[in-house]
């Protein structure tokens, strides 16, 4: 809990610091851009834990000399996904802003056991199909230096099949469609020189996520996330970014933690299989599944580590528990730093920079506070960033305790929300 209190203390300092202390930090450009641009581009996306997919995307920036953007994409391969979003729709210019989006998917993520000590070779492969919509309303002040938002994610999903690590499919599981909803309330204090590409200053974001849970076999809980990032310039052409992240789950209504009762409710039906190796494997997987549910009902599940945002060498969602903590450093060297208009038929806009990045991250998850710092996982690597007017193309190559990863994604790391983790 000390880490959470530290973040809250830093927030109080920020809120109580006189405005004059930040007089030397001014926005480098208008935070509500008007530079029209569009991009039609092939996509070869690699997301740790999901695999590789190919497709195409299109983005239109600052439509009709406004701040509104449109983006859409479609991917097929190891996973299928498509999405469409309208961003920065101003109901009240520069004050009340809305974002809306729709996404559908068919994925088979690698799902590991709970905890920081979970075995990398012990996992299941649930194939999931679903779709969801997102609506967010934001009130903004002082060139987007302070914002508060409410966000709703609503959709549905269902299991198509479940396989073990050897590809053996389980015959008995729930294939019915389940509705999903997550309501989020959050705020951002962004005292930096630029929202998209900060070079100096500090940014703090806090959010509370409220999953709507109607299943009587699941505990009700909510999640609080805290994300603090500082940007320290050394010269005109480089910046050191420092990030501290913490997430807690808070159980408000505890469901059953009795093994026998949960076996009746969520068991895999292994008793229907004939005695033999397949049944033994099913029983072992069922035991893991039920023990996972017991821990989830007792502690809840905070935001996970691994994937595109934190501990980038690990699969998405690799580590999860009732609490999560991580910190990271990223040194960004600006190879070019000028506004360069371009128009190549399938793309038009303004390139504002190309960066080389070097990063290192450490993080852990835990159910008991006594275990907070007992086992930390490490990830480090190098990357390339292409900064455009309104979006950043990011390429990362990283290594860690469980191997290496290559990632192509959009925008800087350490975000609270991303395309692969919108809730």
Positions of predicted regions on the chain:
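C-terminal outer-membrane beta-barrel translocator/porin domains of Gram-negative envelope proteins
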Residues: 185, 196-349
């Amino acid at each position: 809990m000390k880490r959470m209190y530290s973040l809250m203390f830093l927030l109080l300092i920020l809120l109580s610091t006189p405005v004059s202390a930040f007089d030397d930090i001014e926005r480098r450009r208008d935070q509500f851009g008007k530079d029209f641009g569009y991009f039609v581009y092939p996509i070869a996306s690699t997301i740790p834990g999901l695999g590789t997919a190919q497709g195409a995307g299109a983005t239109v920036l600052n439509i009709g000399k406004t701040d509104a953007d449109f983006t859409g994409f479609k991917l097929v391969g190891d996973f299928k996904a498509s999405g469409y979003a309208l961003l920065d729709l101003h109901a009240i210019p520069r004050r009340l802003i809305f974002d809306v989006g729709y996404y559908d998917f068919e994925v088979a993520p690698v799902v590991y056991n709970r905890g920081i000590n979970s075995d990398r070779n012990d996992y299941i492969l649930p194939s999931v199909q679903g779709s969801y919509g997102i609506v967010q309303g934001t009130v903004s002040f002082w060139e987007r230096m302070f914002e508060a938002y409410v966000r709703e994610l609503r959709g549905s999903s269902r299991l198509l099949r479940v396989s073990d690590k050897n590809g053996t499919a389980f015959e008995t599981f729930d294939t019915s469609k389940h509705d999903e909803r997550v309501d989020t309330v959050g705020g951002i204090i962004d005292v930096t020189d630029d929202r998209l590409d900060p070079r100096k200053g500090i940014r703090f974001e806090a959010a509370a996520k409220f999953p709507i849970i109607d299943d009587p076999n699941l505990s009700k809980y909510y999640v609080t996330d805290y994300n603090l990032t500082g940007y320290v310039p050394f010269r005109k052409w480089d910046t050191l970014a420092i990030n501290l992240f913490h997430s807690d789950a808070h159980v408000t209504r505890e469901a059953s933690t009795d093994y026998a009762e949960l076996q009746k409710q969520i068991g895999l039906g292994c008793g229907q299989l004939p005695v033999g190796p397949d049944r033994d494997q099913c029983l072992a997987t069922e035991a893991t599944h039920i023990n996972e549910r017991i821990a989830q009902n007792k502690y809840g599940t905070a935001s996970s580590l691994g994937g595109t945002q934190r501990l980038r060498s690990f699969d998405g969602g690799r580590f999860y528990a009732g609490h999560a903590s991580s910190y990271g450093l990223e040194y960004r060297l600006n190879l070019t730093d000028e506004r360069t208009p371009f128009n190549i038929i399938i793309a038009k806009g303004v390139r504002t920079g190309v960066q080389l990045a070097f990063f290192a991250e450490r993080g852990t998850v835990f159910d008991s506070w006594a275990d907070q710092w007992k086992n930390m996982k490490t990830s480090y690597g190098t990357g390339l960033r292409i900064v455009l007017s309104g979006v950043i193309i990011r390429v990362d190559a990283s290594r860690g305790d469980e191997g290496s990863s290559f990632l192509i994604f959009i925008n800087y790391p350490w975000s609270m929300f991303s395309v692969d983790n919108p809730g």
